[in-house]
Amino acid sequence: MQQQSLRVLSIVLALTAGISCRELLADDGLLPPVTAPIVNGIKVPDGFHVELYADDDLAHDIHSMTIDSKGRVVVSGPGYVRILIDSDNDGRADSFKQFADKPDTGSQGMFFLGSSLLCSGDQGLQIFRDDNQDDIADGPPQVFLKISAGGEHHVHSIQKGPDGWWYVMAGNFAGVTAAYATVPTSPIKQPVSGTLLRLKPDLSGGEIVSDGFRNAYDFTFNGTGDFFTYDSDDERDISLPWYLPTQVFHVLPLSNAGYVTTGLKRPGSYPDMPPVLATFGRGSPTGVTCYRHNQFPEPYRNALFMLDWTLGRILAVPLTQEGSGWKKDGVVFGEGQDQFGFAPTDIEVAPDGSVFVSVGGRGTRGSVFRIVWDAAQLPTVSSDGDSTTRQIDTVLDAPQPNSSWSRAEWIPLAKSLGAAPFQQAASMEKRPASQRMRAIEILVEVYGGLDRATASKLSLAGSGLVRARTAWAVGRSRPEAPDTEILKKLVSDRDPFVQRFALEALSSATSAASFTTTISSIAAALASNDRSVRFSAALLVSRMNDDHRNALAKALANNLRGLMWFHMGRCLRSPLQSVPSAAVALSVLTSKDASAEDRYDAVRILQMTLGDVGPAKNRPVMFDGYAPALSLASIERELNPIMTKVAAVFPSGDAHLDHELIRLIAMTRPFNRDLFSRLLTSITDSTLPADDIHRLAAISQFEIERSYDESVATAQALLGIDIKIRKY
């Protein structure tokens, strides 16, 4: 006690004298002494500084980085995987140990499970074993999943999820097909573009969780178990109407992120898109992590951190709960300055809470930097309770719990304690929600899931976060046939955050009874005031049989918005061309009582229920977003009265709505000279070039003969685009 008092006094005196907590931590061996070179070429917020941990002489052209089970930085580039060694504990690596002379391509994603390394590269996803634990791979790697690897749009990150399954991000050229959905519970059967895969803990089978990405390189989980990724733009389209900036997605199971072709990328404002939390303009997304430690201050705790290779930026999205999801936000946390070469490739949170960032790629200089908060707080160790209580707290409070180094510490301890203490911890109302959620996750991964009694009790928890994690656990405990009595109650929960997780828990269900029991609750969710709850419910429609769908339609007969979202759900995984479905969306679009948001959603759903826009054989790719994906010949007679009503609301005076009305008009190829004239005359000297291209692409779809004056006006509009681009 006297020593502790003296220690506290020394801290107070040191702070009074201007000595930082970091220096005291270094004295105690809790953080390395500050002898690593300070880097001024990377600008970070006040109160942070950047140190050089390793330079190009130790690792050239770093493609990816991880921290192994012993807490050491491991990097990979072409022909190497290296463990960086700080032998004198001065905060800078002074040597390396060559773990492997592969992959030849370098790895774009690594994860240590004990002493074995799972990584992407060369022939696909592979495992290097080090059974004798000498920090050198025992031999050539074993490929456990053949998938295109090594290219910039191939397979990337591999991580352990909170359920103990493996999660893998693959780019749009990785070649993921229906053959990769080998488990019946796979949410998606026919993937499109880039994908997020989920593999069994023993790697014996896999699922496709989400698709539609262009080239998301990395992803992360936050403390509530949500997925997040940072997807790339297509910089060649920067002045075109179908250009989309880099986007931070909140990834929902069963969702499609909207990348179809180079000429068709669906904007985040669409009702059929997962939430976009931030956009960051041009860039090349690389590493992503969620800061689940305590060395950084608020608001960076539990925030997302993403890297942009092209512009040399570290981006941050603080996560603030809003409704069923997360508030849109985003800031630049760090960036290269004064012509300092900074091409970040990966980011990891260290055991001490500092953050490592690697650089490299395309043959460039390799380095590893460490970002540190200057006013680091001393770790607190609770002396309350007995030894078992402290051990439980250690497991529940483990930082970065999905990381290799954290798992190496908490998993053996969790296994030694048995399931009962975690069942009790999950149920204790006095415990923080964060601890209770971790107890639930540990029961799922380590002990096979929640039993019915525990799940029933937790479904009544006072914390919405705990109820949401319970819903997730019910889904992951028995994915094919989750306990629907519990989920039915949670889908109808008072908290939309809980509702969303309960709906997601059904995304792997293969049992018809799973939907029979919950159909009334799903119908109510389709009519929810929360957008992501409606979307999560609509995503489930693709997994239902005709009886379930008929029951949903009947339950929603008197709720126009809910019925519209139901029909959208019918379109999400298979093309639909249905005049009755289109009529529902048209009713919302033309209603004077509908909100601006509902009318915008209606015009998009009207596109979808008429077969949607999309690519077709022998059609230039630039028209993928303006021409029908399916022939409209079979519904031509019924289409005319629909488009007459659409023409009556265009232009609406709402630029956001008109943008999609123009697309709808284009895809129906109307014989309507008045609409043609309205579109052409809306191109003026003050309109933006991307908007002009949007209108001209739509005009090109009209099957009418142009007058001489109309042809001249069209030509002038085309010629004016270059002038406007130079001007703006």
Question: Where are the regions a protein language model picked out?
Answer:
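Bacterial N-terminal signal peptides
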Residues: L9-S20
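Structural detector for internal amphipathic alpha-helices that build alpha-solenoid repeat scaffolds
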Residues: L396-L417, S434-G448, T454-L460, L465-E480, ...
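HEAT/armadillo-like alpha-solenoid scaffolds in large eukaryotic assembly and transport factors
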Residues: V613-L639
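Alpha-solenoid helical repeat scaffolds
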Residues: L630-D654
